[in-house]
């Protein structure tokens, strides 16, 4: 089975968030199920610099008015197709934002071109290779099924995965005439959305099937609270909507072999975790006194509940705990956390930015990680935490609810609990969860039991890859 995956980012070449991790790990996990995946990605400077000896395999003479070369290359275990279009992707900023921190004004064209190239590959323009289906990810690739329906050929099926419905690729109606689509594509059954153009809405309408990254999130986006205005469109296609939870790369995230942490350990031998805890305290220059050490590793935004977290810092300290934070985002939230660190010198440490090695060390050394997201399609941070014996304290939403077993009376009695959930997502709810966590921490036998259960949880891609492979087979066998 040959599948074309289409994405705006892929780990380890270019990453701004969890999308890259998923797109980079899933093809490798699918190999065991007989699925060969080729991933189409934009030819950003960082991507072209990272690969070795790419080979030109096709030339697009007119991709929305620009020429582009298609390069094929193997990078580690990934089979890549790179869309080398300097007019679109040769930028000095990031994948989506310029150096000023604002969206590139032509993002609509940059990612429509990526989708159009994908649709043409799906139609068979590459000599000697044509996919059996196309798997597009998020709004940046959501025009792929649109072009497959309107501009190319709908002979093969398409799957659109929604990683976060908050990002929809919405642009003014004035761009429609430049998208190389027939006039009737601008309508309710196409890409029109309240007199604007919405790439994601178009993909939701035209893909053969839809998926999102956890069963709970698949249910949530059917509601007005979480559907971000698209719940009606998704509801009309609920019969083809699937929720498949993300996994993690269990080789990269393995405390027994991880070279980024201070000391290795396993569920069978947790002693060395204490050495990592000491290393975290030293890094953040906070007290090393054996008290419960909480952490936050996150984008510092309202969606992630960081405003609540900033208000809950005093509660952690009053309970005798400590807190370390790694992340960046909203300047006001960064400031609130930095102020808390100044207020609680020796008890709270904050590092603004993102640091992959430090995130590994924090998972390996902190006792618990707090994830108070208002919505969370899947979340990977809590999966890393489970793997590392760092107890997740999570809002009961989306993938967080699906992957963490709350330490309620029933779960504690049956020895199944792996973390702490709270709802509603309010300051009081978060404070209560923190108090519960501190109480469990002071019961060493229970705490160790929860750690070991989490570490033994199957958070790898193996099961989820099987579900994707089965869905692919189902779509291909049905035809389009």
UniProtKB/Swiss-Prot annotation:
InterPro entries: Glyco_trans_1, GS/SS, Starch_synth_cat_dom
The keyword tRNA-binding is annotated on this UniProt entry: no
Molecular function, one GO term: alpha-1,4-glucan glucosyltransferase (UDP-glucose donor) activity
Presence of keyword Lipid metabolism: no
Pathway(s) it belongs to: Glycan biosynthesis; glycogen biosynthesis
Keyword set, alphabetical order: Glycogen biosynthesis, Glycosyltransferase, Transferase
EC number: 2.4.1.21
One annotated Gene Ontology cellular component of this protein: cytosol
Any Gene Ontology biological process: glycogen biosynthetic process
Pfam families named among the record's database cross-references: Glyco_transf_5, Glycos_transf_1
Catalytic activity entry: [(1->4)-alpha-D-glucosyl](n) + ADP-alpha-D-glucose = [(1->4)-alpha-D-glucosyl](n+1) + ADP + H(+)
Binding site for ADP-alpha-D-glucose: 15
Protein family membership: Belongs to the glycosyltransferase 1 family. Bacterial/plant glycogen synthase subfamily.
Chain's role: Synthesizes alpha-1,4-glucan chains using ADP-glucose.
PANTHER family: ALPHA AMYLASE DOMAIN-CONTAINING PROTEIN, GRANULE-BOUND STARCH SYNTHASE 1, CHLOROPLASTIC/AMYLOPLASTIC
Xref: NCBIfam families: glgA (TIGR02095), PRK00654.1-2 (NF001899)
HAMAP family cross-referenced by the UniProt entry: Glycogen_synth
Protein name per UniProt: Glycogen synthase 1
Organism for this UniProt entry: Rhizobium radiobacter
């Amino acid at each position: 089975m040959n599948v074309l995956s289409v994405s705006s980012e892929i780990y380890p070449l270019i990453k701004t968030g969890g999308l890259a991790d998923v797109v980079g790990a899933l093809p490798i996990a699918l190999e065991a199920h007989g699925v060969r995946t080729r991933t189409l990605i934009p030819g950003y400077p960082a991507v072209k610099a990272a690969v070795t000896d790419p080979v030109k395999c096709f030339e697009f003479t007119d991709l929305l008015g620009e020429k582009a070369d298609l390069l094929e290359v193997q990078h580690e275990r990934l089979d890549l197709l790179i869309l080398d279009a300097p007019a679109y992707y040769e930028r000095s900023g990031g994948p989506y934002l310029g150096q000023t921190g604002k969206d590139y004004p032509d993002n609509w064209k940059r990612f429509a071109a990526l989708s159009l190239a994908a649709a043409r590959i799906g139609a068979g323009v590459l000599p000697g290779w044509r996919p059996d289906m196309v798997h597009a990810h998020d709004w940046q690739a959501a025009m792929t099924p649109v072009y497959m329906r309107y501009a190319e050929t709908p002979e093969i099926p398409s799957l659109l995965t929604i990683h976060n419905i908050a990002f929809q690729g919405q642009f003014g109606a004035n761009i429609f005439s430049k998208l190389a689509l027939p006039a009737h594509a601008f309508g309710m059954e196409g890409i029109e959305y309240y007199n604007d153009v919405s790439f994601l809405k178009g993909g939701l309408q035209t893909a053969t099937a839809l998926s999102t990254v956890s069963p709970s999130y698949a249910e949530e986006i059917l509601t007005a609270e979480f559907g971000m205005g698209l719940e009606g469109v998704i509801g009309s296609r609920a019969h083809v909507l699937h929720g498949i939870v993300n996994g993690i790369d269990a080789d990269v995230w393995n405390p027994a072999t991880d070279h980024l942490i201070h000391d290795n350990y396993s569920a069978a031998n947790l002693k060395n975790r204490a050495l990592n805890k000491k290393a975290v305290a030293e890094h953040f220059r906070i007290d090393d006194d054996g008290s419960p050490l909480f952490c936050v590793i996150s984008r510092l935004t309202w969606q992630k509940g960081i405003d609540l977290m900033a208000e809950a810092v005093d509660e952690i300290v009053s309970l005798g705990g400590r807190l370390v934070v790694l992340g960046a985002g909203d300047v006001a939230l960064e400031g609130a956390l930095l102020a808390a660190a100044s207020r609680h010198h020796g008890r709270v440490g904050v590092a603004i930015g993102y640091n992959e090695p430090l995130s590994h060390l924090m998972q390996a050394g902190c006792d618990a990680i707090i994830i108070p997201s208002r919505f969370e399609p899947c979340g990977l941070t809590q999966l890393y935490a489970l793997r590392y014996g760092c107890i997740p304290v999570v809002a009961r939403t989306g993938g967080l609810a699906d992957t963490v077993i709350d330490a309620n009376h029933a779960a504690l009695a049956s020895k199944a609990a792996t973390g702490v959930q709270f709802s509603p997502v309010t300051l009081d709810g978060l404070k209560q969860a923190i108090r519960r966590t501190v109480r469990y921490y002071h019961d060493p036998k229970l705490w160790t039991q929860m750690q070991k259960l989490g570490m033994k949880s199957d958070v790898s891609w193996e099961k989820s890859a099987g579900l994707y492979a089965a869905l692919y087979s189902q779509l291909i066998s049905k035809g389009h």
